[in-house]
């Protein structure tokens, strides 16, 4: 999940939030139907999620990672029906 050194500074997090398996995805169903209507055959089980990218400063990578975890669990994902994953990279300079 991570790249870069453990020094402090600026970090960029790319966060992907998706519905948990088994949770009905009405947007995904609509997209699958539209793709079929447009002639794209063989498309099934479309899932629609969201992507959040943010920049943060932290004294070290572990603190940055813990902060992003708290952001996801507090605001960015509804943990009852969604799951999340993120990549964290330290910005150069």
Tell what function each PLM region has.
Residues 1-93:
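Long, contiguous binding/interaction regions
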